[in-house]
């Protein structure tokens, strides 16, 4: 008796274009700034038994857990219900795994990587002092219910105060522009800017924004 085909279905997120921006940003933050030094980057490769190709970015998280973002090429767009490109977001431990949404992936990455406001920043903001830290991953807070303290710190970070030095604000803006610019360029362009000093902290636009994920 001939055995029928067995299919394994997994949820993926459609991506409208190619993945160079995503790969370029990951390589920049891993090899240039060191913000993602612990991240494992597996370049675009062929899967032996499949017709599609993929790449993998594995984020080690707290508590022996990991977040893996797999990007797929060459799916079946002729069917009408699949894009040529898509990504899969998976959180897993040694004994358990589950697929997550882009906003959940942002929160998981922010919990381990990229700085946020420290506990003493509220008191510094009330006293009109310079903020000593800032949130370099605001996209991770987009779908959360923020506290009044966090909202106030975001306003101070974005607008600044006349009586304090706005170095933190300027640095944040530079990192913001740098993060978006790097995400749109091919990784080879970084070699041409080898004389530039690395940023002390990079800004991460967010998984959905970089990949242009279509819900």
UniProtKB/Swiss-Prot annotation:
Required for replication in 'nonpermissive' cells, including primary T-cells, macrophages and certain T-cell lines, but is dispensable for replication in 'permissive' cell lines, such as 293T cells. In nonpermissive cells, Vif-defective viruses can produce virions, but they fail to complete reverse transcription and cannot successfully infect new cells. Induction: Expressed late during infection in a Rev-dependent manner. A motif (BC-box-like motif) lies at residues 147-156. The modification Phosphoserine is found at residue 147. Pfam families: Vif. The modification Phosphothreonine is found at residue 98. Homomultimer; in vitro and presumably in vivo. Interacts with viral Pr55Gag precursor and human APOBEC3G. The interaction between Vif and APOBEC3G is species-specific, which may play a role in restricting the replication of HIV to humans. Forms an E3 ligase complex by interacting with human CUL5 and elongin BC complex (ELOB and ELOC). The BC-like-box motif mediates the interaction with elongin BC complex. Transmembrane segments: none annotated. Residues 154-167 are annotated as: Multimerization. A motif (HCCH motif) lies at residues 110-141. It comes from the Viruses. The keyword Membrane applies. Belongs to the primate lentivirus group Vif protein family. GO terms for cellular component: host cell cytoplasm; host cell plasma membrane; membrane; virion component. It comes from Human immunodeficiency virus type 2 subtype A (isolate ST). This is Virion infectivity factor. Keywords: AIDS, Host cell membrane, Host cytoplasm, Host membrane, Host-virus interaction, Membrane, Phosphoprotein, Ubl conjugation, Ubl conjugation pathway, Virion. Counteracts the innate antiviral activity of APOBEC3G. Forms a complex with host APOBEC3G thus preventing the entry of this lethally hypermutating enzyme into progeny virions. Functions as an adapter molecule, recruiting APOBEC3G to the ubiquitin-proteasome machinery. Targets APOBEC3G for degradation through the assembly with elongin BC complex, CUL5 and RBX1. Binds viral RNA and affects the stability of viral nucleoprotein core. May play a role in viral morphology. Its main location: host cell. It is found in: Host cytoplasm; Host cell membrane; Virion.
């Amino acid at each position: 008796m001939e055995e029928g085909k067995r299919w394994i279905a997994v949820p993926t997120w459609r991506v409208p274009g190619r993945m160079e921006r995503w790969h370029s940003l990951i390589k920049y933050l891993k090899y240039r700034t060191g913000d993602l030094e612990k991240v494992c980057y597996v370049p675009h490769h062929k899967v032996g038994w499949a017709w599609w190709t993929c790449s993998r970015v594995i984020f080690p998280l707290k508590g022996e857990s990991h977040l893996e973002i797999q990007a797929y090429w060459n799916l079946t767009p002729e069917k009408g219900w699949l894009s040529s490109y898509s990504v899969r977001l998976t959180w897993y431990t040694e004994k358990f795994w589950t697929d997550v949404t882009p906003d959940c992936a942002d929160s998981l990455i922010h919990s381990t990587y990229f700085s946020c406001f420290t506990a003493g920043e509220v008191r510094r903001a009330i006293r009109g002092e310079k903020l000593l830290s800032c949130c370099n991953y605001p996209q991770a807070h987009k779908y959360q219910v923020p506290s009044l303290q966090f909202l106030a710190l975001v306003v101070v970070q974005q607008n600044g105060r006349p009586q304090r030095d706005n170095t933190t604000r300027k640095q944040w803006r530079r990192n913001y522009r740098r993060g978006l610019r790097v995400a749109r360029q091919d990784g080879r362009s970084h070699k041409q800017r080898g004389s530039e000093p690395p940023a002390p902290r990079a800004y991460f636009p967010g998984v959905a924004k970089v990949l242009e994920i279509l819900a």
